[in-house]
């Protein structure tokens, strides 16, 4: 296979190509040649080998270049192949340097929030660090929601922002915002680079911080004069994170793992409660379940970490979880909480949650242990290592023979039969649950699903079959509307050739609808699946249940003509040159979804659904399992 250097050398011999075409050809050839991504070293120094010299980079290894070029080279050394960047005055030096990169492709979203959500989904769906770049001032502040989202959902991201020149910092200069201060509480760490020689070290540290321990977002703010300053990069500068590295969790001790297995052996009704912290541990988790026979329920972030079609799957628990998952946790005598944080949407009334159970909590973040629910046994460690250790102990002993949870399985199977997920059918009205079931059937549960936030998000969690980690992409902790479309685009960039569907609501979709331009220009095969009820459906559901159906600004259509579908998403999509179809009858759904999936490139399907439908089951906020609501909808007076 050709190396990056030989690919570059072959291109340097082309004397008739224009600089623009040569740059494009060089970029494509080099990307194809790079079969294995370069990884930023965790505890060792970055590779001393300079990127291949090309006509785009006329300097030698020991010759000065701009700080912006040093930044881009540092990104390359950390394995970056895709960035999501929108240019502006304080970041244009970085964009100029990106045009000189033979490796990195920029994906031009139409809003900084969109690009940052895309970077988040890129990371969620691939496990690689997502990178977004914005200019100073409003460009930087437009990243804020996505950074807060990434912190709550433990997503490895590096956000790079341009800043006004150093001499202007603090003068209220044009487009100056103290973004380090703004983001201090919504990032894992952040930097203001004041010395061009710090760029190689800072970038290496940023990627290490973002991806190690509990992952999270890191922001790097770089003044424009630093970007323009000439310097010779010192690639062998080591990281300087002694305190952080010393506090990283160690591999779990065998005696603690043996204690957990003893509790499993003593239990009769154990339940595994699995969250987003198990995203990298799917194989180990499945093996642990195979060895023990413990039923599994997942959080919203944990969907796909254990196959939801497995006989031992209880699917999702919590506010809109299944009856049988919440029943299992309520009746359990042992709760194994792996990679979770006992979020309020899961636990409801915290005192009543798993009230009969001994609790084992394994998490990589010591701050989460005992924060909301005090465990009986806690292990601060990487869940993957803990599962590997317990599997090794189980495989090397006869402990497995002592696990007999047959009667517990029978009890839960009875709950599944008595309380399956379900919905009512009203003639030709399209029930949103039905539309998702058809999508699941036609994709065989293999698509990557991104969502916005609202009722459609919960129905997508309930009615699609998730079979593997990183298949489900949603703003869980922050609940940020507008996540779905840019997230689907970011996932499509990270996973070429994989079907990606944005299951969205009309409210969420409209918040970042401008990214239709991006998916059309890059011809990404993103399928936009809008469940359009002309309302903020989840808020309407709460109005119905708790506010006597008093509508307080939740109708999103045209109040002068409520029968009109407004806005016209089909017309808007066609304005972006994206094929689109609207369906209003149940009998049209199967053929319409099939056509959407078979169409090359992007496609929008506008599915008109009733606004009276409610997401059920539902445990009211602050309630317990005994308070679960199982029936009713907006057609009922409460």
UniProtKB/Swiss-Prot annotation:
GO cellular-component term (any): chloroplast
Origin organism lineage: Eukaryota, Viridiplantae, Streptophyta, Embryophyta, Tracheophyta
UniProt region (Thiamine pyrophosphate binding), positions on chain: 455-535
Transit peptide: 1-39
Gene Ontology molecular-function annotations: acetolactate synthase activity; flavin adenine dinucleotide binding; magnesium ion binding; thiamine pyrophosphate binding
Any single Pfam family the record assigns to this protein: TPP_enzyme_M
Family assignment from sequence similarity: Belongs to the TPP enzyme family.
Other notes: Acetolactate synthase is the target enzyme for sulfonylurea and imidazolinone herbicides.
Residues binding FAD, per UniProt: 214, 320-341, 363-382
Keywords: Amino-acid biosynthesis, Branched-chain amino acid biosynthesis, Chloroplast, Disulfide bond, FAD, Flavoprotein, Herbicide resistance, Magnesium, Metal-binding, Plastid, Thiamine pyrophosphate, Transferase, Transit peptide
E.C. code: 2.2.1.6
Matches recorded under CDD domains: TPP_AHAS, TPP_PYR_POX_like
Reactions listed under catalytic activity: 2 pyruvate + H(+) = (2S)-2-acetolactate + CO2
CC cofactor note: Binds 1 Mg(2+) ion per subunit. Binds 1 thiamine pyrophosphate per subunit.
Protein known as: Acetolactate synthase 2, chloroplastic
Domain of life where this protein originates: Eukaryota
Gene3D superfamilies according to UniProt: 3.40.50.970, TPP-binding domain
GO biological process, one term: L-valine biosynthetic process
Range of residues in the leader sequence: none
Major site of localization recorded for this protein: plastid
List of residues binding thiamine diphosphate: 112
Uppermost EC category: transferase
Region spans: Disordered: 44-67
């Amino acid at each position: 296979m050709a190396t990056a250097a030989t690919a570059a050398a072959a291109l340097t011999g082309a004397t008739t190509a224009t600089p623009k075409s040569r740059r494009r050809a060089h970029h494509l050839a080099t990307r194809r040649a790079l079969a294995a991504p370069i990884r930023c070293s965790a505890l060792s120094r970055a590779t001393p080998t300079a990127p291949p010299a090309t006509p785009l980079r006329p300097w030698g290894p020991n010759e000065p270049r701009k700080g912006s070029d040093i930044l881009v080279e540092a990104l390359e050394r950390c394995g970056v192949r895709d960035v999501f960047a929108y240019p502006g005055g304080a970041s244009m030096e970085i964009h100029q340097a990106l045009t000189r990169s033979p490796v990195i492709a920029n994906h031009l979203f139409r809003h900084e929030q969109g690009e940052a959500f895309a970077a988040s989904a890129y990371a969620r769906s691939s496990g690689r660090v997502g990178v977004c770049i914005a200019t100073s001032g409003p460009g930087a502040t437009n990243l804020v929601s996505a950074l807060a989202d990434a912190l709550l959902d433990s997503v490895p991201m590096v956000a790079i922002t341009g800043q006004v020149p150093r001499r202007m910092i603090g003068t209220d200069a044009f487009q100056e915002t103290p973004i380090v201060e703004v983001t201090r509480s919504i990032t894992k760490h952040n930097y203001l680079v004041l010395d061009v020689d710090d760029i190689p070290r800072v970038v290496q540290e940023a990627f290490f911080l973002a991806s190690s321990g509990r992952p999270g977002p890191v922001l790097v703010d770089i003044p424009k004069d630093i970007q323009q300053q000439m310097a010779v990069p010192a690639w062998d500068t080591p990281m300087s994170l002694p305190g952080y590295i010393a506090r990283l969790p160690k591999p779990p001790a065998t005696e603690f793992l043996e204690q957990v297995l003893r509790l499993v052996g003593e239990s009769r009704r154990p339940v595994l409660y699995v969250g987003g912290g198990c995203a990298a541990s799917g194989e180990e988790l499945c093996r642990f379940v195979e060895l023990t026979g413990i039923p599994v329920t997942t959080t919203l972030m944990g969907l796909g970490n254990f196959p939801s079609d497995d006989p031992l799957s209880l699917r999702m628990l919590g506010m809109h979880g299944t009856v049988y998952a919440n029943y299992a946790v309520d009746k359990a005598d042992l709760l194994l909480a792996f990679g979770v944080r006992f979020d309020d949407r899961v636990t409801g009334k915290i005192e009543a949650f798993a009230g009969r159970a001994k609790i084992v909590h394994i998490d990589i973040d010591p701050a989460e242990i005992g924060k909301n629910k005090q465990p009986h046994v806690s292990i601060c460690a990487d869940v993957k290592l803990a599962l590997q250790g317990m599997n090794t102990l189980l495989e090397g002993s006869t402990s497995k023979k002592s696990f007999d949870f047959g009667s517990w399985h029978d009890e839960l199977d009875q709950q599944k039969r008595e309380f399956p997920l379900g919905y009512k059918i009203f003639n030709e009205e399209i029930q949103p649950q039905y539309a998702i079931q058809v999508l699941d059937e036609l994709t065989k549960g293999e698509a990557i699903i991104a969502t916005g936030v609202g009722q459609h998000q919960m129905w997508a969690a309930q009615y699609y079959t998730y079979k593997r980690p990183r298949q489900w992409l949603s703003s869980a902790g922050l609940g940020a509307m507008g996540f779905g479309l840019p997230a689907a685009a970011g996932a499509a960039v990270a996973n070429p050739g994989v079907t990606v569907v944005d299951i969205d609501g009309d409210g969420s979709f409209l918040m970042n609808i401008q990214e239709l331009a991006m998916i059309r220009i890059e011809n990404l095969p993103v399928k936009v699946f809008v469940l359009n009820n002309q309302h903020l459906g989840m808020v309407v559901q709460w109005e119905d249940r708790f506010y006597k159906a008093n509508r307080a600004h939740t109708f999103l259509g045209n109040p002068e003509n409520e029968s009109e579908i407004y806005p016209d998403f089909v017309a808007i999509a066609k304005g972006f040159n994206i094929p689109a179809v609207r369906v209003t009858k149940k009998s049209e759904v199967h053929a319409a979804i099939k056509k959407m999936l078979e169409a090359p490139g992007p496609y929008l399907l506008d599915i008109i659904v009733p606004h009276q439908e409610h997401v059920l089951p539902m445990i009211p906020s602050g309630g317990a399992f005994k308070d679960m609501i199982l029936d009713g909808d907006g057609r009922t007076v409460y």
